[in-house]
Swiss-Prot record:
It comes from Arabidopsis thaliana. This is Ferredoxin--nitrite reductase, chloroplastic. Keywords: 4Fe-4S, Chloroplast, Electron transport, Heme, Iron, Iron-sulfur, Isopeptide bond, Metal-binding, Nitrate assimilation, Oxidoreductase, Plastid, Repeat, Transit peptide, Transport, Ubl conjugation. Binds 1 siroheme per subunit. Binds 1 [4Fe-4S] cluster per subunit. Gene3D superfamilies: 3.90.480.20, Sulfite Reductase Hemoprotein, domain 1. It is found in: Plastid, Chloroplast. Belongs to the nitrite and sulfite reductase 4Fe-4S domain family. Catalyzes the six-electron reduction of nitrite to ammonium. Its cofactor is siroheme; [4Fe-4S] cluster. Residues 1-20 are annotated as: Disordered. Transmembrane segments: none annotated. There is a cross-link at residue 103 (Glycyl lysine isopeptide (Lys-Gly) (interchain with G-Cter in ubiquitin)). Its main location: plastid.
Amino acid sequence: MTSFSLTFTSPLLPSSSTKPKRSVLVAAAQTTAPAESTASVDADRLEPRVELKDGFFILKEKFRKGINPQEKVKIEREPMKLFMENGIEELAKKSMEELDSEKSSKDDIDVRLKWLGLFHRRKHQYGKFMMRLKLPNGVTTSAQTRYLASVIRKYGEDGCADVTTRQNWQIRGVVLPDVPEILKGLASVGLTSLQSGMDNVRNPVGNPIAGIDPEEIVDTRPYTNLLSQFITANSQGNPDFTNLPRKWNVCVVGTHDLYEHPHINDLAYMPANKDGRFGFNLLVGGFFSPKRCEEAIPLDAWVPADDVLPLCKAVLEAYRDLGTRGNRQKTRMMWLIDELGVEGFRTEVEKRMPNGKLERGSSEDLVNKQWERRDYFGVNPQKQEGLSFVGLHVPVGRLQADDMDELARLADTYGSGELRLTVEQNIIIPNVETSKTEALLQEPFLKNRFSPEPSILMKGLVACTGSQFCGQAIIETKLRALKVTEEVERLVSVPRPIRMHWTGCPNTCGQVQVADIGFMGCLTRGEEGKPVEGADVYVGGRIGSDSHIGEIYKKGVRVTELVPLVAEILIKEFGAVPREREENED
């Protein structure tokens, strides 16, 4: 079993003399478990389903009946051995035809390489891979950005990068023979792609303006860095958590704005005081899937800041040990919570804490429920006197190599050589001397696509990869999202920012359920009765302290008919005014 530990100093308690001055206490009901929190569970059900063997956790023989195909692949060969025992070196020497000729190596390509952050695009880009990184809190450097640009540049039209909805980079066009050198290159600039896909902990999310935010509750960077280092054992691979039943998301909240979207994470740390100590209340179980979407619920538990890591470890161990491994649509952590009951799940977590104890939730939440979410675009003052951060719009999160090089240059020229990625697929340049902001705004790069002042509908636009690169996507998303939004903006004037999210399939990587208006790709019938690209339209998703998952507004809308429908929704639900009427009134 991996031996790994880190310690750090807890932040100062927020007090009457420290920021944020606008924080208020919220009701205790938000941090205590609901009444229906217990379930009748047979003692045999609490037997761990995995065991440690040869340094890795594997599913016990007695629990293998009815398991899903992915679990069988994991049993046949531990995926992390491709990295930890240099299996990737051997794979990289073979042609795709050779690899496809044997089941074991074909499973390596299509399944196990995801543990190294490599996703084969068999359907649309045979032999090409998407590589997902680990980028805790979305913080990256100009050197890292330049290196990634150098990687994708060599792949021509197939090479590009995306900012993801978890503050992360994904690069495209990668071919297998290049992977060993790319992994070395990533390590040389302080990056890793390990344990970023499949049944692993995904990128830890935090406040994108952590440490520079004048109104932050706590700087989330020490916590997200700690979590990422623990999960990957300092980028060496942590076999304790490479065999989860399904993917698992975590975030640390540091702001009243809830940029971190805690309600859709498996584990969310919510800042709270208790008896004069700073720490976190815990939300658990939030997730999206094709068959079910759930908001995270209170665990009725609080941990001091120093126990962020032990708590994460305990939750992961409970999920790893007890989670079901049958139908993949029923293996996310909330299904286990349903089965055990909130209190039963809490007990299992408590058992796995270092001292076997877990404090009850605190009523002293530090997140202000009445807070109006701030916009981070444009020039904004930092908590550090004389410095500002500048938020830039990245249309649907897509960048080319030249774009990344230019961002790196701007970060070096005007800032501190650092960039911040956001869950809305945008980028922030921090630590800009306020005296230099005007010169930055005059840069040609900011005059076109990467504007610090995007239009009111563009600024809230998010889109997944879509069918251009993803084999699971039913429709093209990124270009269509831009086109539909441009056409809608010509039809109506909107009084406030509206968040519109696009996802190409029911896996909802584009997180349509949290959007004001969401579009989920589907096939529908055309005028001649033949299948055509369409979208199920969602309305009513909310983020922030009154977070809520949106609901279906209309199913199976042809993509060619979306523009008038969106304009209609904006007028009926969001106070938009037709452009023609606005011009007449003017």
